[in-house]
Structure formats: structure tokens, C-alpha cells
Amino acid sequence: RPTTMVIKDSVRHYYPIKQGQQLDIMFTITNTGDAPLVISDIQPSCGCIILDKNSHIIIPEEGIRQFKATYNSIKNIGEVVHRIRIFGNMLPDGKAELTFDVNVVPDADYTRDYEELFQEFNAKNGIVKEMVDGKESELGYYVGTP
């Protein structure tokens, strides 16, 4: 049976954080209807958001439940906007959404680009030798006309 719900502060603007920091987001869902609220799924818009939740959640009539999401900013710089979608038996169309934005500030000393991060990752995992001593047909570039 459908019910109604409210997400407290469903649109949020967080203060800037430094790249690499994690942002813990607590959100509160209140079942304002007269039937149990059955949440069948909670989906973040990005793999950088980890949810602390069960797969199937029931909130009784007039009940309140808090959820925690953790945003990892390691791969972002600048203004980011993310959404957390909630699916269940809520009116009017079975879905609700929490939206948040935050400005991820790079380290003031130096900002590494993607190639440097990729090279650092490969060096830690022992892949550099394979990249340097690869086969001639696997160099990743060509000379002359294609």
C-alpha cells in the first residue's frame, strides 16, 4: 500500500573539502503516511558514494530512520553534484531523491594530472616494466600514416 515520506533537507550544499577527504552524509527519512514505508533500493549516482544500509528496509507508520552515506572525493576536483535515489512504495511515483553538492579543493601545493596518478598507481602495482618494455606492436602509438 502506498504511503508518504519526507527526507529532511533533501537538497544540501556542503562547505568545501580538500581532495581526498571523505564527507559523511547523514540523512533522515520520516514515514508521514499511515502504511509502512518499504524501501526496496537506494542507489547513489556515483561509485564514490558508499551507503551504510540493508538491502530491504521497512519504516513503520510515523517512523523515522537515519541512513549514512560516505562520499570519497579522491577522484574529483571542483564543484561536484551527486544524487542518492530512493525507491519504494512512496507516493506519487515510488521514488525520492537526495541531492548534494560540494566544492572539492585541490592541494594548494601541487595538483597531479591523470597521467601522473595513473603512473603512480602502476608503479605501486609493478606494471611500469610492462609499460616500458612492451612489445613493438603494443607501444600505444604509431608513426607515419595509418
Protein language model features and the residues they cover:
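Long, low-complexity ectodomains and other extracytoplasmic segments of secretory-pathway proteins
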Residues: R1-Q21, T28, L91-P146
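Short strand-edge motifs at loop-to-beta-strand transitions and within beta-strands
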Residues: R12, S55-I57, G63-A69
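Asparagine-centered strand-capping/turn motif at beta-strand->loop junctions
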Residues: I29-G33
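Short, surface-exposed loop/turn segments at beta-strand-coil junctions that are enriched for proline
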Residues: N72-G78
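A short beta-strand micro-motif common to beta-rich folds, especially ectodomain repeats
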Residues: E79-M90
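Surface-exposed binding patches on compact interaction domains or structured appendages
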Residues: D34-E61
